[in-house]
């Protein structure tokens, strides 16, 4: 994930200089190189190298796509687009395992790599043929200007608050992802049913992201982010206090707790991301990269620290989500005070 973000940052430096579509093509070309290495690998280490290069290449198009959205949209419309994209993106952990199993049922495992190549080829051709270049040549910037814009992002207090909130909530999400498999396998003993539980949880995040894309234009990104951060704080705090007093975990309760928490996330993530990047329409590509890198760094610090305290029970997840939601609520509702200072 760190490499993915660093490559995204580097790609957006090039993106700001060579254009959006050229940057996507460069990143996808590196991804294809990784695919072919995997396809013709004859050892595990070569296969891992190929996967490494795949991640290296795909980091750029991911961030550039966010920049394209910011080039075309702003404000609540941008938040709506981001939420819709997330609702589709969240379907990946639900559909991908089933798709992979289907390919393996009929073909050899290397056909999964063939599918990667064909799918990326189709999507890249669609982008190149149907999406016009959104960064005109006269707006492309030099390396020295990029350094200046980096300082511009860091000095924007409003965006930095939204970035901090994104990082905290993403940290809570990554904490769950890091320990959910041993938790469900060892503590709840779900065995082969784990993918089903994970799919149900992910579907709640995807559904709420889709609903947010429908209603953000009506209520506004700021209002929705604040309302659902408040609800998330109340929900996680109540459950944390209950578990501190009773320390009684069961599968149904924990799954419901996570599903409701993730449904609140769907109304927050897309809006915060749109609010963070909104002031930087003139440097959308690079700003998107910086926002992604900073929020991921915060998230990795949070999830890495929290995961070290994992004791085999769900308490670490509940505690981390509660602390992160309280911190996010505090930052969002005291934002004006920080800005005045």
What are these regions (language model features)?
Residues 1-13:
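Single conserved hydrophobic/aromatic residue that forms the stacking wall/gate
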Residues 19, 40-46, 57, 242-243:
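Helix-breaking motifs and short loop linkers at transmembrane-helix boundaries and internal kinks
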Residues 46, 81-129:
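Helix-loop-helix hairpin linking two adjacent transmembrane segments in secondary transporters
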Residues 44, 50-91:
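Cytoplasmic helix-loop-helix junction between adjacent transmembrane helices
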Residues 132-163:
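Juxtamembrane intracellular "pre-TM" segments in multi-pass secondary transporters
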Residues 273-312, 320-321:
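A late C-terminal transmembrane helix in Major Facilitator Superfamily
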Residues 30-37, 45-53, 252-258:
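Paired small-residue
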């Amino acid at each position: 994930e760190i490499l993915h973000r660093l490559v995204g940052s580097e790609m957006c430096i090039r993106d700001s200089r060579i254009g959006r579509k050229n940057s996507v093509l460069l990143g996808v070309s590196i991804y294809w190189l990784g695919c072919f290495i995997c396809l013709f690998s004859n050892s595990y280490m070569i296969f891992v190298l190929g996967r490494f290069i795949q991640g290296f290449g795909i980091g750029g198009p991911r961030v550039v796509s966010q920049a394209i959205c910011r080039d075309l949209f702003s404000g609540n419309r941008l938040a709506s687009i981001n939420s819709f994209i997330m609702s589709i993106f969240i379907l990946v952990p639900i559909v991908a395992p089933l798709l992979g199993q289907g390919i393996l049922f009929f073909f050899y495992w290397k056909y999964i790599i063939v599918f990667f190549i064909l799918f990326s080829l189709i999507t890249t051709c669609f982008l190149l043929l149907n999406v016009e270049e959104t960064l005109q040549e006269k707006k492309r910037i030099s390396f020295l200007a990029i350094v200046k814009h980096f300082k511009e992002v860091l000095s924007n207090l409003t965006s930095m608050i939204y970035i901090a909130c994104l990082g905290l909530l993403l940290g809570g999400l990554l904490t769950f992802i890091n320990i959910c498999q041993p938790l469900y396998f060892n503590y709840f003993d779900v065995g082969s049913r784990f993918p089903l539980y994970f799919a149900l949880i992910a579907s709640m995040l995807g559904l709420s992201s889709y609903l947010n894309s429908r209603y953000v234009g009506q209520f506004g990104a700021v209002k929705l982010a604040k309302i659902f951060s408040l609800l998330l704080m109340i929900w996680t705090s109540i459950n944390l206090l209950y578990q501190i007093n009773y320390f009684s975990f069961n599968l149904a309760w924990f799954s419901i707790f996570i599903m409701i928490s993730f449904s609140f996330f769907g109304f927050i993530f897309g809006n915060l991301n749109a609010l963070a990047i909104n002031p930087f329409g003139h440097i959308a590509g690079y700003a998107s990269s910086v926002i992604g890198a900073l929020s991921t760094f915060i998230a990795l610090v949070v999830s890495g620290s929290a995961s070290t305290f994992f004791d085999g029970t769900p308490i670490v997840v509940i505690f981390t989500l509660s602390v992160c939601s309280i911190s996010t609520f505090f930052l969002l509702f005291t934002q004006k005070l920080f800005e005045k200072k």
